[in-house]
Amino acid sequence: MSVKGMAIALAVILCATVVQGFPMFKRGRCLCIGPGVKAVKVADIEKASIMYPSNNCDKIEVIITLKENKGQRCLNPKSKQARLIIKKVERKNF
């Protein structure tokens, strides 16, 4: 292989290794659209999940699963109820 061919091959390999580390999209997809609700009736809560910032979404998301197949709701992470849920989940996990 000529020197020119080797230089091109080396350039392609270097570009491929650099490009591999870049994310496909600048902003990922969050599970919650919009700010979310301020509160949910405690009696209706079946499960609470917290999604911390990651490559997919750059904000904290508090997702509440409701009883009786009523679906899920996103709580505003700045609301009082969401802050209490975050504290409880963090205490439980540590």
Swiss-Prot record:
Record's GO cellular component, any one?
extracellular region
What triggers production of this protein? By IFNG/IFN-gamma and IFNB1/IFN-beta. Induction by IFNG/IFN-gamma is enhanced by TNF in monocytes, dermal fibroblasts and endothelial cells, and by IL1/interleukin-1 in astrocytes.
Residues with the Citrulline modification:
27
Disulfide feature: 30-57, 32-74
Q: Which domain of life is it from?
A: Eukaryota
Mind listing the GO molecular function terms for this protein? Answer: chemokine activity; CXCR3 chemokine receptor binding; heparin binding
Tissue specificity of this protein: High levels in peripheral blood leukocytes, pancreas and liver astrocytes. Moderate levels in thymus, spleen and lung. Low levels in placenta, prostate and small intestine. Also found in epidermal basal layer keratinocytes in skin disorders.
Q: Where located?
A: Secreted
Q: Principal localization?
A: secreted
Please name the InterPro entries in this protein's record.
Chemokine_b/g/d (IPR039809), Chemokine_CXC (IPR001089), Chemokine_CXC_CS (IPR018048), Chemokine_IL8-like_dom (IPR001811), CXC_Chemokine_domain (IPR033899), Interleukin_8-like_sf (IPR036048)
Record-level GO BP terms? adenylate cyclase-activating G protein-coupled receptor signaling pathway; cell-cell signaling; chemokine-mediated signaling pathway; chemotaxis; immune response; inflammatory response; positive regulation of release of sequestered calcium ion into cytosol; regulation of cell population proliferation
**Would you indicate the residue range of the signal peptide?**
1-21
Keyword annotations for this protein, in alphabetical order, are: Chemotaxis, Citrullination, Cytokine, Disulfide bond, Inflammatory response, Secreted, Signal
Extract the PROSITE patterns matched here. SMALL_CYTOKINES_CXC
Q: How does it assemble?
A: Interacts with TNFAIP6 (via Link domain).
Regarding protein family, the annotation reads:
Belongs to the intercrine alpha (chemokine CxC) family.
Stated role: Chemotactic for interleukin-activated T-cells but not unstimulated T-cells, neutrophils or monocytes. Induces calcium release in activated T-cells. Binds to CXCR3. May play an important role in CNS diseases which involve T-cell recruitment. May play a role in skin immune responses.
Q: Spell out the protein name for this chain.
A: C-X-C motif chemokine 11
